[in-house]
Amino acid sequence: MVNNSKKYCYFFNQFFVGRNENNMRRLYADIILNKDELKDSSRSLIEIEYYKISKKIWRNVGKKINLYGIEIIKKEYLGRRKVKEKNNLYNITSDEGVIDNLLNVLKRNRVTPIGLKDVIEEVM
């Protein structure tokens, strides 16, 4: 039973997490908020990373298309501790230009992982 579980986890990682040529995650932007920009002075630094994610799927016989999504990772540095928060939305569109525009809006407005879904719903 344990052996089958390990095989399933390996399959899951290979198929869904992006360890093959059909999946991709690329850093789009990285912003850093320093202590002067933060209202809560207990935090010394916040880093927000915006990723464009894509997955190739078969649309018709012999034809693959890319479906694009977005992932945001927020890292808060509290002294020597680091707190990480992450959220993603898969398969938003097949148009890479739309995803680039969405990522630009997210970066410009410094959207954190918790607000990702709301902002995407508002913009789309």
What are these regions (language model features)?
Residues 1-2, 19:
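Gram-positive cell-envelope targeting signals
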Residues 62-84:
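A short, structured beta-strand/loop element
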Residues 8-56:
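Negatively charged, low-complexity tracts enriched in Asp/Glu with abundant Ser/Thr
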Residues 9, 97-124:
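Compositionally biased, intrinsically disordered linkers/stalks adjacent to structured regions
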Residues 83-97:
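A short, exposed loop/beta-hairpin motif centered on an aromatic-Gly-Thr core
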Residues 52-54, 58-62, 78, 105-106:
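Basic helix-extension-helix modules of the SAP/HeH family
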Residues 45-47, 80-87:
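Short, mixed charged/polar active-site loops
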